[in-house]
Amino acid sequence: MKKIKVRYAPSPTGFLHIGNARTALFNYLFAKHNQGEFIIRIEDTDFSRNVKGGEASQLKNLRWLGIDWSEGPDIQGPFGPYRQSERLAIYQKYAQKLLDQGLAYKEFQENTTTFAIRFRVPTNQTFSFDDLIRGKLTFQSQEIEDWVIIKSNGYPSYNFAVVIDDHLMQISHIFRGEEHITNTPKQIMIYQTFQWHLPQFAHMTLILNDNKKKLSKRDANIMQFIEQYEKLGYLPQALFNFLSLLGFSPLSQTEILSPQELINLFDVARLNKAPAMFDTVKLDYLNNQHLRKLTPEVIASFIVQKKYLTLTTAPTNDKEWMTKFVSLFQDRMNYIQQIADFYQLFFQTKPSLSQEATIFLQTNPQTTLILKTFYNVFDVIVFKKDVIFNAIKQVANQNDFSKKTLFMALRIGTTCKMHGPSIALLLELLGKKQVLKNLSYVLKQAQKF
């Protein structure tokens, strides 16, 4: 059996896009599942679209996702160069072979010596291939005009260069978007003309936005680039997980899967024909689940490293405080940058009450006495979680307050919020000074009613 070898061949037009990342991932999963090779090739012959630093950005984003490769522009290999702009002589050689055989011809621009080279499409021929996802697809040659293989500037067209490169680099399988289906008959013509073995194609489903239209870079309500997710604190393994499920239904009891589990489960037979929906709610859920698998210490270190709390007054140099803080909110985080929102929500220096909290104070006359009781208790105790917990328990046991009213009054009085995480640890992290300040403020508001 021929060794499996796949490639991801981006243009260096900027950051790694969601759709391109999915393409890279499917090729990578297929290669790794079958103990094959995954390589990178850069298609950079359209200089008008190339972006400075675009290639480096693509490679950096791929590595962040956890994708590695055995050949590429950065590490080279036996079939290089791996940039199309460095392979022009190769394309010219094969174009000349077609000219010599009368299978291509020069098309001169009017009144100039400048010319393009067009491939002479054979008449009355059928071009078919067995798509690994869609089954047999067939095209007729009369549907296709003679097409340019070398442009007038000397650079190859996409459909010519990609065949030369894939053949010389011994690519066995090609996973790509369904928009490439119409390119395939032109590419088959080149394979057949040179009597080269045809690779196996798999054209992946479209990715749709929440309006069930093809995902576009113009979709302002969906972040389009991997780097954006990295900056917000999405985990690479979570994004790897999410993107792998866009058009793939693994035979698994859970959708929360590690990269290695996805490699083990990858099966071309379970790739979908129907379009895949880019569901940001599902992405947040998956990232939350992957975050829960990490220790608070790991997330705390990440927060400090990425400086997610630099715009707050959080004591980021206090590792113990940061770890406890993360443990409070870890299960609530969809992405790590949300930690700053949680901090601002609870650790505001100027207390204020929501309308919902104000209504509670108005409709529960016991609140004033409860707040006074807790103020007096908290004023004299050591402000550590266990001590705070026992103090709250003692107040609850020694007084005839309604438990529901007592605990809601406690939460509003100490945090100015109706809802939140474990109260004892939260109060320890807030500190006695801030807690008493909040209690004093809320008590004054309650006494107005």
From Swiss-Prot:
Entry GO CC: cytosol
UniProt keyword terms in alphabetical order: Aminoacyl-tRNA synthetase, ATP-binding, Cytoplasm, Ligase, Nucleotide-binding, Protein biosynthesis
SUPFAM superfamilies: An anticodon-binding domain of class I aminoacyl-tRNA synthetases (SSF48163), Nucleotidylyl transferase (SSF52374)
Catalytic reactions on record: tRNA(Glu) + L-glutamate + ATP = L-glutamyl-tRNA(Glu) + AMP + diphosphate
Main location: cytoplasm
Molecular function GO terms recorded: ATP binding; glutamate-tRNA ligase activity; tRNA binding; zinc ion binding
GO terms (BP aspect): glutamyl-tRNA aminoacylation
Pfam families in the record: Anticodon_2, tRNA-synt_1c
Motif ('HIGH' region) on chain: 10-20
Keyword Transferase attached: no
CDD domains: GluRS_core (cd00808)
Function: Catalyzes the attachment of glutamate to tRNA(Glu) in a two-step reaction: glutamate is first activated by ATP to form Glu-AMP and then transferred to the acceptor end of tRNA(Glu).
Alphabetical list of PANTHER family matching this protein: GLUTAMATE--TRNA LIGASE, GLUTAMATE--TRNA LIGASE, MITOCHONDRIAL-RELATED
Protein family (similarity comment): Belongs to the class-I aminoacyl-tRNA synthetase family. Glutamate--tRNA ligase type 1 subfamily.
Protein name as it appears in the record: Glutamate--tRNA ligase
Source organism of this protein record: Aster yellows witches'-broom phytoplasma (strain AYWB)
Lineage of origin: Bacteria, Bacillati, Mycoplasmatota, Mollicutes, Acholeplasmatales
